[in-house]
Amino acid sequence: MLLHGTAGSAADLAQAAFFEALYGAEEPLDLSRYFLVIPDAIGAGDSSKPSDGLHTHFPHYGYKDQVRAQRLLLERVGIKHLKLVLGTTMGGMQTWLWGEMFSNDMDCLVAIASTPAAISGRNMMWREMISQAIRSDPAWKNGDYPKDPPSKNWIKTAIPLSAIMTGSAEQLQKQAPSRETAIDLVDELEASGEAYDANDFLYAFESSADYDPAPGLSR
């Protein structure tokens, strides 16, 4: 089972680059040998989410809820044991939770760009800044805004911050090697933010509040 990152979806793991590097013949996750399950997390892709209509009346969920939902999905399709759980960023953190919550259900865990510890420090500061950017936007209206709000001021802060949070310094330097390209990149990121729903984005980042697998990993 492969788990996507924060504010992403299963579609992120179905891009051509993954087929070339991971899913092709003789590659680590060769599709002719393995059955891959790539679910949309709660609040992402085609899964249920606030923007379906409930707005902030949608139940708040955490990473543990997402892991339980993933396990229920496996039960529904008749999969009793996994060869591998692999995830990146948010998916990596959920991978650690799989190890804590359902340690007998898989042979191997691969948690990428994540650590088995509660979110704190710089990572938590970024998340709080993203949440505050959304909650302080007048157009957010406590989460009860029209489908197409007149403005999305929150994306000017939240989307570039999200890119800094999830991208490496080396990657961002390659994308923006000069002053001009850095400014252009910020503009591009803001433009891409128009595709996001404020409540969906807020819920996704705040869902990490229950994440702390460390105490249970030694069991």
Each model region followed by its residue ranges:
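Catalytic nucleophile-loop/oxyanion-hole region of alpha/beta-hydrolase
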Residues: 53-65
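N-terminal cap/lid subdomain of alpha/beta-hydrolase-fold enzymes
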Residues: 1-52
